[in-house]
Regions:
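Glycine/aspartate-rich loop-and-adjacent alpha/beta segment that forms the canonical ThDP
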Residues: 2-3, 225-323
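A short, conserved beta-to-alpha structural element at the edge of catalytic cores
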Residues: 165-185
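Cofactor-binding active-site loop characterized by glycine-rich and histidine/acidic residues
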Residues: 29, 33-165, 183-189, 194, ...
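Conserved thiamine diphosphate
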Residues: 133-137, 189-221, 263-290
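Short beta-alpha connecting loops at secondary-structure transitions
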Residues: 177-182, 202-207, 252-260, 285-286
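Cofactor-/ligand-binding subdomain signature composed of acidic, glycine-rich
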Residues: 1-36, 57, 277, 303
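Acidic, glycine-rich active-site loops and adjacent beta-strand->loop/helix elements
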Residues: 65-71, 145-151, 173-179, 210-213, ...
Length: 323
């Protein structure tokens, strides 16, 4: 673990990060038992929870599609509501008008990805940061996206605007090394996203995405810098997509021995082992936390499965438009 755990506040924060990752994984594991087309983020929880747990309630968060449910949980969403949304039940965030794992919670300062189009959330984040700059609030904004989306032109338009106008935004690449079946080693010219971002004159750094404490520290420092009016930061959080692009993806296009090596770097197991070795948790504590997360997910899934399906009333004007 890159950051020593040596005080009560840090211990509490790191336990919170561990619980956040465990809850996210438990919900995703439950979902994959009923959905063959879910886009799992197993092994990427360090980037997701490290980023979204660094946000204050006033900050703005925009998640990548992979892990959007984990990000929503990190921001206080009800797991039953998120699962209901994936199942298309009336108790979901869209009341059944849309089903899928792209739908996050509806909440102030949090914007889920409500379609499969990748990249627009980067522009939304830049716009949110511009708004906070113009109104003088200077709240921080953080957006996550994959290395495939990092080749989108909108990212570079956004980096340029954020740098030119010194906007309070943190760009976090959830760099899992695959865009469906295309490895990033064959898709990123020059091999470095950090060099690309640094060319815009902003701080740009690479962190170990499987070290949730390192991610949380980097994002927290970048957000503090943003709130001080010192502008944007780019963070390339290197991780690995140990699951398929979707649940039923056999991953025949890649070397499974590499996947096995990355599985050994699991962010949950790394933090749990660190807390145990530091004497801040026992293995029984870790097991109890995991069991609690799995019980919560199981209950949420059972409840959501029993929830009603939508009827035609969900497209009535009062349910489709804000007052």
């Amino acid at each position: 673990m890159s950051v020593a755990i040596n005080n009560r506040a840090a211990n509490s924060a790191h336990r919170d990060l561990l619980l956040s990752m465990m809850r996210g994984r438990a919900v995703e594991d439950a979902i994959q038992k009923v959905s063959g087309h879910y886009h799992p983020a197993r092994g990427e929880e360090g980037v997701i929870c490290g980023t979204f747990r660094a946000l204050s309630d006033a900050d703005v968060g925009l998640p990548h599609y992979r892990g959007s449910i984990i990000a929503s949980l990190s921001r206080g969403a009800d797991p039953r509501e998120l699962i209901a949304g994936l199942l298309g039940k009336v108790t979901g965030p869209t009341r059944g008008r849309q089903r899928g794992d792209f739908v996050g919670k509806f909440a102030p300062n949090y914007f889920g990805l409500f379609s499969g189009t990748l990249g627009p959330s980067i522009g939304y984040a830049t716009g949110a940061a511009l708004a906070s700059k113009l109104d003088g609030s200077n709240v921080g904004t953080a957006v996550t996206f994959g290395d495939g989306t990092a080749n989108s032109g909108l990212l570079y338009e956004s980096l340029n605007m954020a740098a030119m106008y010194v906007l309070p935004v943190v760009f976090v690449c959830q760099h899992n090394q695959f865009a469906v079946s295309m490895p990033s080693s064959r898709a990123i010219a020059g091999g470095s996203l950090v060099q690309r971002a640094a060319a815009f004159g902003m701080p740009a750094l690479e962190v170990d995405g499987n070290d949730v404490v390192a991610v949380h520290t980097a994002v927290s420092e970048a957000l503090a810098r943003a709130r001080r009016g010192e502008g944007p930061t780019f963070i390339d959080a290197l991780t690995y997509r140990v699951s398929g692009h979707w649940t039923s993806d056999a991953c025949t296009y890649r070397d499974q021995s590499v996947t096995e090596e990355w599985t050994k770097r699991d962010p949950i197991e790394r933090l749990a082992a660190s807390l145990v070795s530091e004497g801040l948790m026992t293995q029984d504590d870790v097991d109890a936390m995991r069991a609690s997360a799995e019980s919560e997910a199981s209950t949420a899934m059972a409840t959501a499965q029993d929830d009603p399906w939508p009827d035609a009333s969900v497209i009535d004007a009062p349910n489709a438009f804000a007052e």
